[in-house]
A protein has these predicted regions:
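Membrane-interface helix-loop junctions and terminal tails of multi-pass membrane proteins
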Residues: 1-188
Length: 188
């Protein structure tokens, strides 16, 4: 496996941008994360990052899905995933340093949330594969978020680590479980 330094930086910066610009909006005057405004912000931010860093995945669901489908070698996929986590951790640490709340407990992984993550991952990968990472995929992320599909991102893990909530096993299982199930759906 050949190291792709530019690709590694793209994954980290993209994930950090999502963490800072979308999750960084948590304050008493910001729109709640389950609102259409935040879904739109997430979609636009992802679209811009995907267009800026062509070929980057940025979302662990896409990375896991591409590894499971055999489109990405496991070594490269693992490196992409780790760089996404690093970028999210750096972004969450900056937010925590500013005094922002960066940790929100994830809901327990239920059969319903697993099914929606599976279908959401499948649909997102369908759009991403056919149209590429761009405004179309970003707009579709917004639609999925407005519909209530949980797209556990590296930001969720970065916030958990930065706020010192790693001992909350229910949250950790919910975030990783949603990510893995979404990745399996993306591989279908």
């Amino acid at each position: 496996m050949e190291m792709n330094e530019k690709g590694m930086v793209a994954e980290a910066i993209g994930s950090m941008a999502i963490t800072l610009l979308v999750w960084g909006g948590i304050s008493e005057n910001a729109a709640p994360h389950d609102s259409a405004v935040m879904a739109g912000a997430a979609g636009v931010t992802l679209a811009i990052m995907w267009m800026t860093f062509r070929g980057s995945e940025i979302l662990p669901i896409i990375t896991i899905g591409r590894m499971a489908a055999g489109h990405t070698e496991w070594q490269q996929g693992t490196l992409n995933f780790l760089m996404q986590l690093l970028g999210a951790f750096v972004g969450a640490t900056v937010l925590a340093w500013q005094g922002e709340t960066v940790f929100e407990a994830a809901e327990a992984l239920t059969a319903t949330s697993a099914a929606t993550a599976l279908l959401g991952g499948f649909l997102l990968m369908l759009v991403w594969d056919r149209l590429g990472g761009g405004w179309e995929a970003g707009a579709f992320v917004s639609v999925l978020l407005v519909a209530g599909v949980t797209l556990a991102s590296a930001s969720s893990i970065g916030g958990t680590i930065a706020d010192g909530h790693m001992a909350d096993t229910d949250n950790f299982i919910a975030v990783f479980g949603t990510m893995i199930v979404g990745g399996i759906g993306a591989a279908a």
